[in-house]
């Protein structure tokens, strides 16, 4: 894959991840003036995750680092635009939720309960469940850590 193809794939990923970020921001009643910023933050988060995964990081660590970036930028923008950081960050990380692995784990659980136990199906269930849980944990920890760092009143040492 050439640099132009990679750049075009990255731009496509960022544009397509901005759309659900705006959609969920509208569901959460984010003010209209903040919708473009939610789209930009969703695109930056998903694009940075894709960039790190292309560099060789696994999806869990890439998601953690991308959510750290989203949380930090959201806190800075909340100071500039006098809004709560969750206005920008919550809708921006929703495109990074692990839909495919969670769905595969759920389908595996249904197949096990319907067809009976089989070792390959149980391995698929556990693998996808742990992957989805790790990604959701990375998202939640990555969003909360910048607030703990930046809003700390006492000295760290």
Swiss-Prot record:
It comes from the Bacteria. GO terms for cellular component: plasma membrane. Disulfide bonds: none annotated. GO terms for biological process: succinate transport. Keywords: Cell inner membrane, Cell membrane, Membrane, Transmembrane, Transmembrane helix, Transport. It is found in: Cell inner membrane. It is a multi-pass membrane protein. InterPro entries: ThrE_2, ThrE_Dicarb/AminoAcid_Exp, YjjB. The chain crosses the membrane at residues 6-26, 55-75, 87-107, 129-149. Its main location: membrane. Belongs to the ThrE exporter (TC 2.A.79) family. The transporter is composed of YjjB and YjjP. Involved in succinate export with YjjP. Both proteins are required for export. This is Probable succinate transporter subunit YjjB. It comes from Salmonella arizonae (strain ATCC BAA-731 / CDC346-86 / RSK2980). The gene is yjjB.
């Amino acid at each position: 894959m050439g640099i132009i193809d990679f750049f075009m794939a990255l731009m496509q990923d960022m544009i397509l991840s901005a759309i659900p970020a705006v959609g969920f921001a509208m569901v959460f009643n984010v003010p209209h003036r903040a919708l473009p910023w939610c789209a930009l933050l969703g695109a930056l988060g998903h694009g940075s995750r894709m960039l790190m995964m292309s560099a060789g990081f696994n999806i869990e660590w890439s998601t953690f680092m991308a959510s750290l970036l989203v949380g930090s930028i959201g806190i800075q923008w909340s100071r500039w635009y006098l809004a709560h950081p969750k206005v920008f960050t919550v809708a921006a990380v929703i495109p990074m939720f692990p839909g495919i692995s969670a769905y595969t784990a759920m389908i595996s659980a249904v197949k096990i309960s319907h067809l009976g136990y089989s070792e390959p199906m149980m391995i698929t269930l556990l693998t996808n469940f742990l992957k989805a849980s790790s990604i959701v944990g990375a998202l939640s920890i990555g969003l909360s850590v910048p607030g703990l760092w930046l809003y700390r009143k006492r000295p760290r040492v």
